[in-house]
């Protein structure tokens, strides 16, 4: 069983993906970390985030161990990742890696921004997780503050808005929901309520596939 979870920044998709993977005992891949690790490699080496050749080389040479880097989830890396993710050759370089993971015997859970549309268009379950811009900004600001990083709400909200715009307008694999995805709005849901709602979506899909 392949479960594809897509959604914008701070919608809660990563948390839901991890919980579902644990529940169904499936491997989980946060595909956003691939782009974050690519961006981090460029920043560390002094490369240019908008140089297509440099970014593509970083993606092709990605070391899976780098996905464990402590600062991958920083806001700076997140913004940089959104820039390299708009480069077609970077997406192509990382696509095969993601598809190989999705082909894990028994299934897998992947979350990102183009899982249900590009990486796993035939996924058994597709969930598009969303939330209001204000709710997502509040969550991200709280997350940053919890790590001791600057988390000014207005700044965070504008950064998320800009990232949404970049992702939606990139030339390759623009961010959008799959036509057959089930929407889950987490604006007014806590983690447990969101998980229960996601679990209900998956269970319902399993029943339909079995019938």
Swiss-Prot record:
Residues 153-172 are annotated as: Disordered. One of its GO terms (molecular function) is ATP binding. It is found in: Cytoplasm. It catalyses: CMP + ATP = CDP + ADP; dCMP + ATP = dCDP + ADP. ATP binds at residues 7-15. Its EC number is 2.7.4.25. Coiled coil: none annotated. One of its GO terms (cellular component) is cytoplasm. Keywords: ATP-binding, Cytoplasm, Kinase, Nucleotide-binding, Transferase. It is an enzyme of class 2 (transferase). Residues 158-169 have a biased composition (Basic and acidic residues). The keyword S-adenosyl-L-methionine does not apply. GO terms for biological process: pyrimidine nucleotide metabolic process. The keyword Lipid biosynthesis does not apply. Belongs to the cytidylate kinase family. Type 1 subfamily. NCBIfam families: cmk. This is Cytidylate kinase. It comes from Beijerinckia indica subsp. indica (strain ATCC 9039 / DSM 1715 / NCIMB 8712).
């Amino acid at each position: 069983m392949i479960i594809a979870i897509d959604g914008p920044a701070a919608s809660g998709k990563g948390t839901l993906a991890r919980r579902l993977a644990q529940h169904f005992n499936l491997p989980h891949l946060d595909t956003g970390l691939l782009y974050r690790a690519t961006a981090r490699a460029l920043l560390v080496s002094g490369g240019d985030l908008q140089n297509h050749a440099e970014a593509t080389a970083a993606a092709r040479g990605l070391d899976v161990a780098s996905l464990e880097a402590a600062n991958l989830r920083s806001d700076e890396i997140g913004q940089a990742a959104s820039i390299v993710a708009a480069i077609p050759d970077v997406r192509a370089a990382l696509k095969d890696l993601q598809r190989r993971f999705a082909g894990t015997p028994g299934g897998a859970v992947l979350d990102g921004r183009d899982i249900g549309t590009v990486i796993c268009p035939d996924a058994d379950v597709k969930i598009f997780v969303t939330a209001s811009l204000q709710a997502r900004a509040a969550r991200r600001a709280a997350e940053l503050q919890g790590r001791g990083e600057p988390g000014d709400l207005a700044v965070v909200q504008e950064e998320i808005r800009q990232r949404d715009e970049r992702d939606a307008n990139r030339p390759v694999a623009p961010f959008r929901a799959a036509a057959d995805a089930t929407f889950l709005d987490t604006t007014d849901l806590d983690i447990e309520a969101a998980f229960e709602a996601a679990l209900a979506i998956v269970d319902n899909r399993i029943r339909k596939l079995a019938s």
